[in-house]
Amino acid sequence: MSRTGFIQSKVGGLPRPFWVLFGGTFVNRLGTMVEPFIGIYLTQARGVSLATTGLVMTMFGLGSLLSQPVAGWLTDRLGRRITLTGGMVATAVTMIVLGYTTSVPGLVVGMLVLGIVVDAYRPASQAIVADLVSPEDRPRAFGLLFWAINLGFSVAMVAGGWLAHSGFTVLFWVDAVTCLIFGLLVWRAIPETRPAREDAQPGRFADVLRDRLMLAFVVGNLVYSLVYLQGYTTLPLAMTGQGLPTSAYGMAMAVNGLLIVVVQPLTNAWLARFDSSRVLAAGFALVGVGFAVTSLASSAAGHAAAVAVWTLGEVLTAGIPGAIVAALAPPHLRGRYSGLYGLSWSAGTLLAPLVGTRLLAAAPGLVWPLFGAFGLLAAVGQLLIGRAIRRRSAQTA
């Protein structure tokens, strides 16, 4: 295959508005500097206790939990473009206000609001891709967005740590500006893709909840999220508990970012040739295996190797859930279906640290094999509903 043909297989055939969304997503993630450092900001810059910091972080998770169904409803009701742009503008304003808030009640309320608005763009973004991209190209398109998110976030982690030395307020302003750029790009360059009113059917969130196949998919993803998110919640605690320095966790997670940035674009188009449910199940299983072998790791290199295993599983899952949701959702309910899917991640974000840290304290020898079993359970569940997903996809293609 020629170089041109190779590049065409990876990025060709996608409409211009998709690339605007891709670029805006990348810019937005370049500025994602507040969330990763919010715990350090609260304890060091604002002098907040660890207990209060935990409360503030919980409010952020609660806000995210509330935002997904609401944003999904707005996406279908008002439109994709206005929901995404409105969410970005609201996030920018909240970031700036939060950066100058000093009282604990203000921080609690501010983080709740931030949790509501910061990810409100997700259902709209997913619906735009579903509206614009053909079913056969959706796994590739969602995979490219996944790559943009991870590449931007990797840069933001490094840049945010450096900029924080100049004062944490800078992080809030950078985050706000990149949110505004994303919102402006969408408003100016992406047309509204929601089905015309005369073509759209009436629909309610209750209609989504009656879709047993979608509910089964969401429950399986929730189980998977409980496993995957341990890499960001319980794993650093387990490593420091083994006497490893904080830098060891940073090195292990650098392996995660490097593998995603390098491997995922190379495999994205190739994986799209296979059945989505089987690839997703393989990814769930490999993530489970990666966390299970964490129980064998006692050094920085050992943990980095375990992270490499579950990162390869993460690469397998890139883009596929969004494509499955798009295939399951009727056009007039795409926002709400995407919101329900996002709800599984928001719930996982709340539950993962609670479950993981308690297991680590009560049964440190069982925590990683148990999460490995959860990953395999999610894989089996995905295989069980795979035939029904294929049948529904064929009907909606």
What does each of the following model-derived ranges do?
Residues 1-15, 191-220:
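Juxtamembrane intracellular "pre-TM" segments in multi-pass secondary transporters
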Residues 16-61, 215-252:
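Helix-loop boundary and gating motifs at the non-cytosolic
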Residues 33, 61-69, 153-154, 257-265, ...:
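Residue-level signature of mid-helix packing/kink "hotspots" within the transmembrane helices
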Residues 66-102:
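Conserved MFS/SLC helix-loop-helix module at the cytosolic interface between two early adjacent transmembrane helices
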Residues 67-79, 263-276, 360:
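Helix-to-loop junctions at the C-terminal end of transmembrane segments
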Residues 82-96, 278-293:
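Structural signature of the two symmetry-related core transmembrane helices
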Residues 110-149:
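Cytoplasmic helix-loop-helix junction between adjacent transmembrane helices
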Residues 177-196, 381-386:
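C-terminal membrane-cytosol helix-exit motif in multi-pass small-molecule transporters
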